[in-house]
């Protein structure tokens, strides 16, 4: 009932929008669709913890793009946190070594697409409202799924040996009751994420909010080990730690900056009496 009422309100808001705004909202939604597909395709070949950690170069990209496109100011501390986390990503990917896998570039592409998606979110903060934004985003999900539905059901790809492509284009596995339960939980979680994340990026500076997304890294490590038995390598542990440290450092510096700003504000005369 809640979902139906939300999208009912969303459709009414979409109808009110001018064509230009609908186009921009749709471009934003397709950026997220591309990020989602690249992310899940990379999971066909890579451990969950590595995919999530590489994907979390996205807050770094959000910080940089917010400075270039949105003209938000980033100081030396934010730049330092970006560089620290970038070293972590390099340690995980290890380009030029036998540990590097081309599928890692898919996770990196997902990060870039997601960063552009959030820049759209921030730049469109004064256009439409949250109902319309999330509704168009979910219509983009639906439209992009239709071609894959026909491929998967009516012309599934024969196994190629490429785990990522097979994961995307193989024939359907009919879900069990347990599978459907997990799918429904995931769908509801994504809806909640869409609403809360979109609202946050519309109301707070993108470069300030981005580091908070790093909380997903320790969770991905835990679930990767607990469910799939994917234990990261030593260098991957170091890389993940650096990415997490970079995010925490950025959050800490923003908190220090807020305290410094507050302390410089003169106390009102009435409060001093």
What are these model-predicted stretches?
Residues 1, 41-58, 101-113, 176-190, ...:
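Structural signature of hydrophobic alpha-helical transmembrane segments
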Residues 1-27, 143-184, 191-204, 253-273:
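Membrane-interface interhelical linkers
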Residues 18-28, 74-87, 103-109, 128-140, ...:
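Cytoplasmic-side transmembrane-helix entry/capping segments in multi-pass membrane proteins
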Residues 29-37, 59-64, 89, 111-115, ...:
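Hydrophobic/small/kink-forming positions within alpha-helical transmembrane segments
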Residues 58-80, 218-237:
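C-terminal transmembrane-helix exit sites in multi-pass transporters
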Residues 77-94, 235-254:
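Hydrophobic transmembrane alpha-helices of multi-pass small-molecule transport proteins
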Residues 98-123, 263-273:
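Glycine-/small-residue-enriched transmembrane alpha-helix faces in small-molecule transporters
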């Amino acid at each position: 009932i809640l979902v139906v009422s939300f999208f009912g309100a969303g459709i009414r808001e979409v109808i009110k929008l001018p064509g230009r705004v609908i186009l921009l909202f749709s471009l934003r939604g397709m950026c997220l669709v591309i990020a989602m597909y690249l992310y899940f395709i990379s999971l066909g070949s890579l451990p969950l913890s590595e995919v999530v950690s590489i994907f979390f170069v996205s807050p770094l990209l959000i910080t940089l793009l917010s400075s270039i496109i949105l003209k938000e100011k980033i100081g030396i501390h934010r730049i330092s946190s970006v560089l620290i986390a970038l070293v972590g990503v390099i340690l995980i990917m290890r380009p030029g070594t036998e540990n590097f896998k081309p599928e890692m570039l898919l996770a990196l592409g997902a990060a870039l697409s997601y960063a552009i998606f959030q820049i759209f979110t921030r730049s469109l903060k004064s256009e439409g409202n949250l109902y319309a934004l999330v509704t168009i985003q979910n219509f983009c999900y639906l439209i992009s799924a239709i071609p894959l539905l026909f491929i998967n059901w009516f012309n599934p790809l024969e196994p190629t040996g490429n785990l990522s492509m097979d994961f995307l284009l193989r024939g359907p596995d009919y879900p069990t009751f347990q599978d459907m339960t997990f799918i429904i939980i995931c769908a509801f979680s994504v809806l909640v994420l869409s609403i809360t994340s979109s609202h946050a990026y519309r109301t707070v500076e993108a470069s300030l909010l981005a580091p908070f997304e790093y909380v997903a890294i320790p969770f991905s490590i835990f679930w990767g080990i607990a469910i799939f038995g994917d234990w990261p390598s030593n260098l991957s542990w170091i890389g993940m730690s650096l990415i997490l440290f970079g995010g925490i450092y950025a959050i800490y510096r923003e908190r220090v900056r807020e305290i410094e700003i507050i302390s410089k504000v003169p106390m009102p005369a009435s409060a001093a009496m």
